[in-house]
Every structure is written in C-alpha cells, then in structure tokens.
C-alpha cells in the first residue's frame, strides 16, 4: 500500500459550544489533547507531509500541535469559511514550500480523538484498490439529524454526493448513512476541483463535499467506505460529548490492559490515561487514577483510591490510598495509606 503524500488535519474552528476560553482541540481526553490524538493517528499512516490548518486562537493551537509533533506544517486559514477553504489553504502552503500534490491526500479533523491509524490506513487501502479519485468514510446511525447524508448511485454503489442537513430535502433527511468527514483524495484532482467550488449553499461556505460531487460528475470512482465502529468518527462539540468520548476511550484502555494480564477490579471506577504502562500480574483496585507516563511493574497492588502521575513503580509495590507524582518507587515498596509523595 502506498503511503499518503500528505495528511491534512483541520483545526481552525472556534468550538463555541464547549463554552471554554481554551480552543476545543486543546482539551484533553485520557491524557492527550484532542489535536494530539488526531496527529498521532495521522502520523501512523507515514505520510510524506503532515499539515494542520489553524485559525481560532492560532498561537495557542499551533503551539500545542508542535508540542505533539514538531514536524507538522502549520497552514493558516483566511477569512473565507468552510472545510473546502481550509483544505485549499493547506494545499497552498504545501505548494509554497515546493512540495508536490501528486498522490493521495488524506483529510481528517482535530476533534475526532478516537480515530486511529488503522482506520486511516484501511481508507487509503480501499482508495488504492478501487482506483478512486475520492474516498470517504461513512457510517450508519439510528438518528442522522445534523449530519451530511450519503447519496449513492443505485447502479454502481458509488457516492454521488453528500448533502448537508440544512440543504437536504425531506426524502434525503430519511437516509441513515452519514458522512463521517474523513477523506482520501487524488491530490491533483483535489487542487483543481477546489478552484471551482463556490459558496452557493445555505451556510455560505466552501464545502469540501462538493469536490466529491465534481468527481462523480466527471465519471471518476467515488468510493464510500462504511465504518463499523461509529466511535472512530465521533467528533466532539461540547462538554457532554467530551465526557462520553473520554469514558469510552477509558473503557477501551482498561480492556486492553486486562487482555494483557492486568487485573482491574472495577474498570468503571478506574481511570487510566493513554500513555500509562502496566506490566502483567498487577492488580488495580477501585477509584484509582493513573496519569501521564506512569509505569507500573509486575506484581503490584495499586489502590483503592490511589492517584499516580508520572510515577515509576517497581515490582511488588503496594500503594493503597496514596497520591504519588513524579516519583520512582523501588521494588517491594509499601506506601502507607493517605501518603502524598511529590517531587
């Protein structure tokens, strides 16, 4: 499978529904910012170039992006709104730096923290196998309200167009297959098509979805890849969705640790961030929080009611009801309950 020429991560939005002084994509989910998760997934496709498009609170967002990955190219979106315009700004920045747009270009979002590299690589693989000009991830939901609907060709099954909620007819609003918002494009077609995309829609924006419609009208292959795991494309618009995403990601982290030989007595009350490492045959008791780059060796008993932050715990340690931060515990250490250790 060929690797992408570029992955473009869109992170220019204000995220006003978060009701926060912080940009939406900077909010943490299980120990990593949303944009950090997006960049981690994008890097897993091994692209030639990784680009992030910014606008709202530009300096803060750009700093968080570069903290996660200093090799990311920062592109600035101008006053023209819309996802299509954001991608156009990214392409312009690549061209300004002398990079080719030939090959596959992936487009994803900075507020979809559960999307992983495996899913992006599967999209690229399907795009290549079908010889597609545009491929889009889709998913089928019970309630499609608010999402762009996927309109398919009844003969070929290709995606004809994507209709946004505000532009959809009553019949189109009954369709349950929705746009997950993650794309693979032929890079040169994408560049040319965006030059012809206008703002003739109810939002007055440059829609990226119009590129797909152009490809279909030009008799190109427009590929729809159905995503079975809806969480992979779940965006975050407010604090409620933030909590839901964090809970699901934490559940999956706990499951992975248990499959690797860690005993977690009550996963529902145990919170483990994404960079924590735990060896087999350690037991985690309820109401325990493991944060940062905490590492726990084999044979330990952690909790109940313990918080570890960037702690290194040697084999055979017992740490009940304690707060330990930035500290190394040697093997077989027993920490007294209600102890706080911070260095």
Task: Please annotate each region the language model reported.
Residues 1, 203-343:
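Left-handed beta-helix
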Residues 1-6, 33-110, 114-125, 129:
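Conserved N-terminal catalytic core of the sugar/cofactor nucleotidyltransferase
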Residues 5-29, 45, 68:
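Glycine-rich N-terminal loop/short-helix segment of MobA-like nucleotidyltransferase
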Residues 9, 35, 50, 90, ...:
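Residue-level signal for inorganic ion chemistry
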Residues 11, 54, 109, 138-139:
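Short beta-strand/turn micro-motifs composed of small residues
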Residues 22-28, 79, 197-200:
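Short glycine-enriched, charge-decorated loop/helix-capping segments at active-site entrances
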Residues 28, 114, 184, 235-236:
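Short aromatic/basic micro-patch
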Residues 115-202:
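Conserved core of the sugar-phosphate nucleotidyltransferase
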């Amino acid at each position: 499978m060929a690797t992408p020429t570029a992955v473009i991560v869109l992170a220019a939005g204000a995220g006003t529904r978060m009701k926060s002084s912080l940009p939406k994509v900077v909010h943490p989910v299980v120990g990593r910012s949303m944009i950090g998760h997006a960049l981690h997934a994008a890097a897993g496709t091994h692209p030639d170039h990784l680009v992030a498009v910014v606008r709202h609170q530009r300096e803060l967002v750009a700093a968080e992006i570069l903290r996660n990955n200093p090799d990311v190219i920062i592109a600035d979106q101008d006053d023209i709104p819309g996802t299509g315009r954001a991608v156009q700004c990214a392409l312009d920045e690549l061209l300004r730096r002398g990079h080719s747009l030939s090959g596959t270009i992936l487009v994803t979002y900075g507020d979809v923290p559960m999307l992983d590299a495996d899913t992006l690589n599967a999209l690229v693989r399907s795009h290549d196998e079908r010889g597609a000009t545009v491929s889009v991830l889709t998913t089928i939901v019970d309630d499609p309200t608010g999402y762009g609907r996927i309109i398919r060709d009844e003969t070929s099954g290709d995606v004809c167009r994507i209709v946004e909620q505000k532009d959809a007819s009553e019949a189109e609003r009954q369709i349950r297959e929705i746009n997950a918002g993650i794309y693979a494009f032929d890079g040169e077609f994408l560049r040319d098509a965006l030059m012809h995309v206008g703002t003739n829609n109810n939002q007055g924006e440059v829609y990226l979805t119009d590129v797909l419609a152009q490809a279909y009208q030009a008799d190109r292959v427009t590929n729809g890849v159905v995503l079975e795991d809806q969480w992979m494309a779940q965006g975050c618009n407010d604090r409620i969705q933030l909590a839901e995403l964090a809970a699901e990601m934490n559940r999956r982290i706990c499951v992975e640790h248990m499959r690797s030989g860690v005993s977690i007595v009550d996963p529902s009350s145990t919170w483990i961030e994404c960079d924590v490492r735990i060896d087999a045959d350690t037991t985690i008791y309820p109401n325990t929080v493991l944060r940062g780059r905490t590492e726990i060796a084999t044979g330990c008993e952690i909790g109940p009611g313990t918080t570890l932050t960037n702690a290194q715990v040697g084999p055979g340690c017992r740490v009940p009801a304690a707060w330990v931060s930035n500290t190394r515990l040697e093997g077989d250490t027993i920490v007294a309950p209600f102890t706080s250790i911070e260095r």
